[in-house]
Amino acid sequence: METQSEEQAVTKPADSGGEGGPPQVAGAQAARPEDRMTLLLRLRAQTKQQLLEYKSMVDANEEKTPEQIMQEKQIEAKIEELENEVEEAKTAFEMKKLALDRMQLSTALKKHLEKVDIKTSVLMDNMKQILNLNKLIMKSQQETWDLEEKLLDVRKKRLQLKQASERKLLEIQTEKNKQKDDLDSMENSDKIKAIQQNLETEIQITTVIQHVFQNLILGSKVNWAEDPALKETVLQLEKNLTMI
């Protein structure tokens, strides 16, 4: 419903104003923004439909893969970009339409005054001043549109950088998952199991030797706490090798 109302709003023809050439010029100049807005609205509707279909497919799965999350973020960012372009196009269209209406009104009034009374110099001067002001307004609006286009380019570049960073994060996550899988496969291999068994055997033997040395030192009744070297040796013997 929202898309249909917006399409009706943007495709409504501008008021013709008066008779003669200016209304036709307004219609010709307003046609291109209308076509652009209609295209943007159609693209936004198609993208939304694709997102809904994609979400329904994802909901059928138990969990999302990093690739699916990445694609979903890209689609949402594209929808936001299209919505911004639609709003900017609508604003630009309205501003152009208002400026053209002002110029048409000023031109029609000027011609009317020329026909009614050629001596109305004060009004003619005012009308010329109004026309000059309209030209200045159009120039300022053009500069504003140029700045908006530059801002849009900056936003697009920022979006591209964001997508590139997300792709890099996805690559890092994929590499981490691969390393984890490789490590799991190594832990399950017979070679790793044999190494672990040998290590446990060596730890047990070393622990027995530690206990023997501790008993020898304690049995000798030497005050090992006063001898720094002997104290360090005793403290080393108290370490639990299974925690290393």
UniProtKB/Swiss-Prot annotation:
- Which cysteine residues pair off into disulfide bonds? none
Annotated Gene Ontology MF terms? kinetochore binding
User: Mind telling me where the Glycyl lysine isopeptide (Lys-Gly) (interchain with G-Cter in SUMO2) cross-link is?
Assistant: K64
- The biased composition feature labelled Low complexity covers 22-31
Q: Listed GO cellular component terms?
A: kinetochore; nucleus
Q: Does the keyword Ubl conjugation apply?
A: yes
Q: Where is this region: Disordered?
A: 1-33
Q: Where in the cell is it found?
A: Nucleus; Chromosome, Centromere, Kinetochore
> Where are the coiled-coil regions?
66-104, 146-189
Output the superkingdom of the source species: Eukaryota
Modified positions (Phosphothreonine) in chain numbering: T65
Residues that the record marks as modified (N-acetylmethionine) are M1
| In-chain residues carrying the UniProt-annotated modification Phosphoserine | S16
Keywords, comma-separated and alphabetical:
Acetylation, Centromere, Chromosome, Coiled coil, Isopeptide bond, Kinetochore, Nucleus, Phosphoprotein, Ubl conjugation
Q: Which GO terms describe its biological process?
A: chromosome segregation; kinetochore assembly; mitotic spindle organization
Functionally, this protein is described as follows:
Component of the CENPA-NAC (nucleosome-associated) complex, a complex that plays a central role in assembly of kinetochore proteins, mitotic progression and chromosome segregation. The CENPA-NAC complex recruits the CENPA-CAD (nucleosome distal) complex and may be involved in incorporation of newly synthesized CENPA into centromeres.
Q: How does it assemble?
A: Self-associates. Component of the CENPA-NAC complex, at least composed of CENPA, CENPC, CENPH, CENPM, CENPN, CENPT and CENPU. The CENPA-NAC complex interacts with the CENPA-CAD complex, composed of CENPI, CENPK, CENPL, CENPO, CENPP, CENPQ, CENPR and CENPS. Interacts with KIF2C and NDC80.
Please state which protein family the record places this protein in: Belongs to the CENP-H/MCM16 family.
> Could you tell me what this protein is called?
Centromere protein H
Give the gene name.
CENPH
